[in-house]
Amino acid sequence: MGARAVLGVTLAVACAGAFFASILRRKDLLGGDTEASGVAGLVEASRLLVDEAIHTTMRRNLRKRGIFSPSQLLSFSKLPEPTSRTASRAAEIMETAVQEVKRRVCRRRDTDQLPTDVLSEELLSTIANLSGCLPHMLPPSCPHTCLANKYRLITGACNNRDHPRWGASNTALARWLPPAYEDGVTEPRGWNPHFLYNGLPLPPVREVTRQVIHVSNEAVTEDGQYSDLLMAWGQYIDHDIAFTPQSTSKAAFAGGADCQLTCENRSPCFPIQLPTNASGAAGATCLPFYRSSAACGSGRQGALVGNLSWAAPRQQMNGLTSFLDASTVYGSSPAQEQRLRNWTSAEGLLRVNTRHRDAGRAFLPFAPPPAPPACAPEPGTPAARAPCFLAGDSRASEVPGLTALHTLWLREHNRLAAAFKALNAHWSADTVYQEARKVVGALHQIVTLRDYVPKILGAEAFGQHVGPYQGYDPAVDPTVSNVFSTAAFRFGHATIHPLVRRLDARFQEHPGSHLPLRAAFFQPWRLLREGGVDPVLRGLLARPAKLQVQDQLMNEELTERLFVLSNSGTLDLASINLQRGRDHGLPGYNEWREFCGLSRLETWADLSAATANGRVADRILGLYQHPDNIDVWLGGLAESFLPGARTGPLFACIIGKQMRALRDGDRFWWENPGVFTEAQRRELSRHSMSRVICDNSGLSHVPLDAFRVGQWPQEFEPCASIQGMDLGAWREAPPSGDACGFPDPVEDGGFLLCEERGQRVLVFSCRHGFRLRGPAQITCTPRGWDSPPPLCKDINECEDETDPPCHASARCKNTKGGVLCECSDPLVLGEDGRTCVDAGRLPRASVVSIALGAVLVCGLAGLAWTVVCRWTHADARPLLPVGEGEGDGKSPSLPLPGCGNRRDVGAAPALEVEQDLSCGSRGLCE
């Protein structure tokens, strides 16, 4: 018994000793604090560091308004919407905090100890929570109403019931192969100048562009089969399924260096180094480049996620839904959707431009403040008056062809909505909106999978990698993959023509109608002032795309003049693509060939056969020196085409695999039984891109297949002969035979009708910024509705202390359905709409004070001047000869120099000395 007691006491003492030693060790590693306070302080310090870098970026951007440098335009095109920005900021705070834990651990110990060995799982989760990442890592709450099977959520969440985050916006891009970071976790390929691949350094991306990719504008070959619309649709549909935001900061987190100026790799700055025999504008030795934002719970944050290890690599975020769902039209977040809808309409319409019309048709609305005025102003107008267009994707104003497609689909939604309301007067505005949105999404799917992708892959590869539709498969993850978004689908950049062709009503060119691409970047005023959408559409239909030829990959409008609106610099799209692949840690070309079941290329002969061009193989191997080192985007781009295709075997495999996943993993795919009726599916299949153009533009003739280049007029058909949908398939009889009818409209909300167990059900929702008070759904019973409808009450976001809508630098003012962040003069609201920044100007009160002071000083000076001059005049008068005053006709009156009179040349020089003496000094008088 005594021995047991002694043993028990010994074990207790040992455990207590180990426990307190563990506490002391953790306290020491966190800089002397206990776990909780140490972690909280560390996260707060990381938040301050990240926010200061973001604040510095916004301050610099404000001071550069009106200076349209290419890097600034690129930044605007990659500007995330607020929900994505919040997720990106949280990921950066989280990663910065964990990097600091790692640094402290390594500094105090010789071993490469992991944060998971130092902090408890509870405190690791605390870091995720304090940084703001946790909400972006948890599964969303999915609705269980009868609408769950009728309409997709705007965020794409809950499409898959078992994996509700699959395909949702603001989640990580999928990885089909493990990434190849230089430290295994986060550092891009090419980050460390002395890091070797197969014993060799990677070539600078700018040198790859110059030697392999670049071709002059005059040397391009045109596609004899496909129209420029094929290229434009590829860009448009890419913007429907993928958007990887750049870091929210353009200043280094450590030290605040400006990423537009520094040539050092200091996250998030990852500049493109220029060859030693070349320099950029003003002698620059690099081009600016910013890393893509990490997704929450990846990279050095991986240790903080339950089932992930420390080695979980950095992932990149997709700010859009992965699905082909027309997010280009409707957005990918509730806040964005709210900005796009016309809430005063009973027809479920989208907002249109209220200042400009296109021959009676709608233009896209302008983006409201505080969006930066990044679009180029019309010549002769102030730079501050150059808003970009507002659409579901922030890149809608990049080039006229892209803007034209956004405009077409805005008009198509409103056309369908008006027709549906005319057919079904009993439909609520929300029902009309959702039904039109559902049809527009289906048309995006049809045009892409039926008409576009087979032309890109070729019939054989399409059958192999995509094949016929077999129905929805809940085991298929539809999430857009990193290699698809960052490499394979960027093949389209090699099909961009250096000219924007605009044609008149007879499809003829005229002087000044064509624009070099550099004169069209971010210039929406050209559509407003130079003929509207129709001339651009005619050019897309009747002029060929550029053909992707191995030794003519990208023209100089993209490699030398990307986003160039002035002489303030340049960017190179080819180098950006290569650098982005390295930033994302994409494995090399051979790894992806093996992934697709293709043979690895080991020799020059192998590469020469794959490209069908020995000269190109020479150039590539001359730079990379080993086939395994070739960047996947370049390798896939250089492959010779498959039969009837516009890609080689590698990109055909990756694009086909992705498109099949987008189709088979989408519960709301248009062909999935139950999404549409059989009659509706039949009508949808009759529609085409040509019909959309006929219905929403001034064109009276179009090709039957809008993606095949047509010769005017013999290969164009009148719009009357282009078949389309009969919307009668969407006619519904109004409910009858019950005691319910329809309730009164809900202010700041709406309702949708569906059936549940044979009973009519109304499901209510509120606009963004409002909260339901009352039941979310009511059911029709024999005695009427089982409950009165709910109310929509405004949410006071300013009371949210866990996730405040405004930065601490701003005052929060609640508004109906939203919030307004206000700044005290001289601070102004930054581009994020929540932070006050210094614009580098004096306060308005100071300006007024200075102006009043200047007036006072001038007044006093004038008074003093008057006194001096009167005194001078009085002293000088006795020196005048008697009888020679004014009006005697003998002598002109003498001027008083400097006292307000006009000096007459040659007047009484003998009296100058006396006048000077009486004034006191010539300087005073003058």
From Swiss-Prot:
Belongs to the peroxidase family. XPO subfamily. Pathway: Hormone biosynthesis; thyroid hormone biosynthesis. This is Thyroid peroxidase. Residues 738-793 form the Sushi domain. Binds 1 Ca(2+) ion per heterodimer. Binds 1 heme b (iron(II)-protoporphyrin IX) group covalently per heterodimer. Heme b binds at D238, E398, H493. The chain crosses the membrane at residues 845-869. The gene is TPO. It comes from Sus scrofa (Pig). GO terms for molecular function: calcium ion binding; heme binding; iodide peroxidase activity; peroxidase activity. It holds the Pfam family An_peroxidase. Interacts with DUOX1, DUOX2 and CYBA. Iodination and coupling of the hormonogenic tyrosines in thyroglobulin to yield the thyroid hormones T(3) and T(4).
